[in-house]
Design a protein with these regions (language model features):
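Paired small-residue
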Residues: 65, 76-84, 277-285
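Juxtamembrane intracellular "pre-TM" segments in multi-pass secondary transporters
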Residues: 163-193
Length: 370
């Protein structure tokens, strides 16, 4: 919930701190940059010490900077606390993917990855929705205290409910981890998935960060509550993403991703329409295509990578969140230069790159699991 919740209140923060579009983009990108930096390292560390304890510890750490955002006096302080938030997130995301890949096999992995992505989608919606409406009720500062309390409760829930790993085998050998890293960097499955991941989050962050500024401005003038409601389009992804397993089993990862990216591009084009209802439909179509792409991509790794899964997941998330960081920055420049229309053309360019990667980079084997 914490990574993108700030998008719902960006127009308010820009007004409160007299921030520019580029500064707003970097506040969003700060968390994503930290996640990109830490993902492979936390992946290696988790391979050495375990899974459940890592997830719980990361959730507990995440509580602190979330609460400290409420004390920020400048946009730069918000950026710092957002960066610290990002340091803990890979301990949740990377390790969870490795946990699923180790504890389950075959079709179950693909299905659980789809449910994992659906949960991430739901969390992304809830973070933006809650913070947007909390701002209208009690202000964004108090809203962040509520978000911190919810994160703490989440840590306690995971402590009680998540089963201890049964299949985990510790690998404390750092030299072995480096060798595994080297093999991943020349593994076509891993490299292709990493490049696709970068394109996926570039598109998602660029679109859903700056559509807020666009809809808060003339002629729409949407407030934080209305902007938070826009993110309800994420809920379509909660339904569609698990259904994507049917496509994956029938057509394979590559074909599924190609179709999903094309659908996402059509959604981005729809946001150029003037009526608000068409823009909302476009966002729903765009995000659904992105979520199916992400689900297919991480399943592609989980099914085809047998050794060093946590490190492979870490590499994927390094590229995934690096793409989001670059997306926040480049789209901020595009929006500052040519408003939403220029941002759309940039998003379409990156999605064309994703099409090329899926078409020529992925190994097109149809698998019962992938």
């Amino acid at each position: 919930m914490q990574v993108y919740s700030i998008q719902a209140i960006l127009p308010v923060l820009m007004a409160d701190f007299s921030a520019t579009e580029v500064q707003a983009g970097m506040v969003v990108g700060a968390t994503i940059l930290a996640i990109a930096i830490m993902s492979p390292f936390l992946g290696m560390l988790s391979d050495a010490v375990g899974r459940k304890s890592f997830v719980v510890g990361a959730l507990l750490f995440l509580t602190l900077p979330t609460a400290l955002i409420a004390q920020s006096t400048t946009i730069e302080w918000i950026g710092l606390w957002r960066f610290l938030q990002g340091l803990s997130v890979p301990g949740i995301t990377v390790v969870t993917i490795a946990y699923i890949g180790e504890e389950f096999e075959g079709r179950a992995v693909t299905e659980l990855m789809s449910f994992y992505v659906s949960g991430s989608v739901l969390g992304g919606f809830m973070g933006r929705f809650l913070l947007g409406h909390l701002h209208e009720l009690i202000g964004w500062r108090a809203g962040y205290y509520v978000m911190a309390a919810m994160t703490l409760l989440g840590a306690l829930w995971v402590t009680k409910m998540l089963p201890v790993s049964r299949q985990f085998v510790a690998n404390p050998n750092f030299r072995s981890a480096i060798q595994t890293l080297g093999s991943h960097l020349v593994n076509r499955y891993v490299v292709t998935a990493c490049l696709l991941g970068a394109c996926v989050l570039f598109s998602l962050v660029g679109c859903f960060t700056f559509i807020n500024l666009y809809l808060a401005d003339t002629p729409y003038h949407l407030g934080t509550g209305a902007l938070a409601n826009i993110f309800a389009v994420y809920l379509i992804g909660v339904i569609i993403t698990p259904l994507s397993t049917i496509l994956l089993r029938r057509f394979g990862s590559a074909r599924t991703i190609i179709v999903a990216v094309i659908i996402s591009m059509l959604g981005v084009l729809l946001t150029l329409a003037t009526p608000l209802w068409l823009i909302v439909i476009g966002l729903g179509v765009m995000s659904s295509g992105v979520f199916v792409t992400q689900s297919a991509t991480i399943s592609y790794i989980a099914v085809n990578v047998k050794q060093g899964r946590s490190l492979a997941s870490g590499l994927y998330y390094l590229f995934y969140y690096a793409g989001g960081t670059v997306g926040a920055w480049l789209c901020s420049l595009a929006y500052a230069y040519g408003q939403w229309q220029f941002t759309v053309w940039l998003l379409l360019f990156v999605q064309v790159l994703a099409l090329l990667i899926a078409s020529f980079g992925m190994i097109k084997t149809k698998s019962k699991a992938a």
